[in-house]
Amino acid sequence: MNITLILFLIGILGFVLNRKNIILMLISIEIMLLAITFLILVSSLNMDDIIGQTYAIYIIVVAGAESAIGLAILVAFYRLRGSITIEYK
């Protein structure tokens, strides 16, 4: 469980510290989702329950769909602005 906490904190730090790069923000969100998935899998194996493994597969599918949608939005953003950096004013 310590590994999942470390992974989740790395994802949060990556999201907070890289506020200008959209790709790094998406990668940080994926790291957070995979940390939660790993925690659910470890808990499922400790409790000897198959439901947690089913939830983990569901989370991985949702994370893949989220990545595809995020990258599609990123391509549209790049075509509109010509850059993927976010400018705060």
UniProtKB/Swiss-Prot annotation:
Enzyme class, spelled out:
translocase
Q: Which GO terms describe its cellular component?
A: mitochondrial membrane; respiratory chain complex I
The enzyme's E.C. designation: 7.1.1.2
Q: Does the keyword Electron transport apply?
A: yes
Q: Does the keyword Translocase apply?
A: yes
Write down the membrane topology: Multi-pass membrane protein
Q: Which InterPro entries match?
A: NADH_UbQ_OxRdtase_chain4L/K, NUOK/Mnh_C1-like
Q: So what does this thing catalyse?
A: a ubiquinone + NADH + 5 H(+)(in) = a ubiquinol + NAD(+) + 4 H(+)(out)
UniProt keywords (A-Z) are: Electron transport, Membrane, Mitochondrion, NAD, Respiratory chain, Translocase, Transmembrane, Transmembrane helix, Transport, Ubiquinone
Residues in the signal sequence: none
Pfam families for the chain: Oxidored_q2 (PF00420)
Q: Name one GO biological process term.
A: ATP synthesis coupled electron transport
* TM ranges: 1-21, 22-42, 57-77
In which family does this protein belong, per the annotation? Belongs to the complex I subunit 4L family.
Spell out the PANTHER family in the cross-references. NADH-UBIQUINONE OXIDOREDUCTASE CHAIN 4L (PTHR11434:SF16), NADH-UBIQUINONE OXIDOREDUCTASE SUBUNIT ND4L (PTHR11434)
Q: What does this protein do?
A: Core subunit of the mitochondrial membrane respiratory chain NADH dehydrogenase (Complex I) that is believed to belong to the minimal assembly required for catalysis. Complex I functions in the transfer of electrons from NADH to the respiratory chain. The immediate electron acceptor for the enzyme is believed to be ubiquinone.
Q: What is this protein called?
A: NADH-ubiquinone oxidoreductase chain 4L
Q: Can you name the source organism?
A: Neurospora crassa (strain ATCC 24698 / 74-OR23-1A / CBS 708.71 / DSM 1257 / FGSC 987)
